[in-house]
Amino acid sequence: MPDRTTGFRFQDTFLAIEDPNIVPSDRMPGILRKCMSTITNGSNGTNGGGYLEFERPLAKIEKQIEELESTQAVTGRDLSEMIRTVRSELLTAKRKLYADLNAWETVQVARHPRRPLTPDYLGMMVRDFCELHGDRNFRDDRAIITGFGRIGPHKCMFIGHNKGKDTKERLENCFGMAHPEGYRKALAKMKLAEKFGVPVVCLIDTAGAYPGIGAEERGIAYAIAVNLMEMARLKVPVVCVVIGEGGSGGALGIGVGDRVAMFEHAYYSVISPEGCAAILWKSAEHAQTAAKALKFTSKELRKLNLIDDVIKEPLGGAHRDPAAAAASLEKYIVESLRDLKRVKPETLLKRRYKRLRELGSFFTVEGAAAAKISATKPRTRAAIKRAPKVIVAPATARPVAIEA
């Protein structure tokens, strides 16, 4: 169906790939235009070796290794010692680089075109996977994949975003941006899991929910809100892991659980850095500044107690060794389910509710700030006192009470 604001059809995107002149770029919705640019221009700024912009020094060292190996093969000279030395340099440089990635570099790794997706992880760590389709209401949203399977000794319901591997699949799946039907599909499968007493495992990897008019007309915000409410009271263990991008309500729609974890180089944010920059600075060029301000990396979110655990990735990111990343993810899920299945459903619900109520920290200050708070309405003072976590800041802090 055509987009009601632009007259754009998804079929047009296939034509644009073959010949961009057939479908003018100004007829494409902005978010699809960006995705199309990713497909046609060598996704996410990577070169032929899959290196990102900030990884260029590593690419140079790897090229040296390739040249030495080629010279050794052609001339027959023994260059093994030199190759070992350069490989050691590559390993050291990689460790140093990935020990302290900034927020924007983390976003680039999370979006790497070779990064494993939900179907990849399901294929590597889940046995007897049986996919389930449809929301029993309107249609089957391919941006969300659901199904029963076994992981370790546990039978589970698996739910996750599916961005797609090739161009055709990415377009069919809207690059992992789910419509309302996707979230209703996920909820229907969660309720099915609850009926059979089976734990739910959610793998989050989306830039956000689909932002089209059709999705709004069919109640995308309502669908996500209902999922938040229903996931909070599911009577089975729920484990959620951000495996790549965790964008806004699109991620939250399957992100309420007893355990919430992130891969080391994933990000989890209220908005994409480009979206934030467009709002605050009226230009996506400030995306790096926005990324730093949003505090959405795994380390920062763990410090804020917004997530429970950080899952280590192979050196260089999950795309460098998908099997090792899958092994780490499988271990975390199996151990989490082992612990959660020992807890009675009533206790599980109380803990989950308590966990949700304690999200966020409230900062208070003394002196002039205390006087300012005292001058507020009684209801406001009571709300401040009921804050789940109170951090007393130094007297030199700004004289305001804010929610972080």
Which role does the model predict for each range below?
Residues 116-118, 166-168, 210-212:
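Short active-site-adjacent helix-start/loop capping segments
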Residues 61, 102, 158, 205, ...:
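Terminal peptide-recognition signature
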Residues 31-155, 323-404:
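Intrinsically disordered, low-complexity segments enriched in small/flexible residues
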Residues 204-334, 338, 342:
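Conserved catalytic cores of soluble enzyme domains
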Residues 99, 128, 138-140, 146, ...:
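Glycine-rich beta-alpha loop segments
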Residues 8-10, 14:
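Aromatic (phenylalanine/tyrosine) cluster motif
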Residues 3, 12, 19-21, 26:
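Intrinsic-disorder-associated, low-complexity terminal segments enriched in Asp/Asn/His/Tyr and depleted
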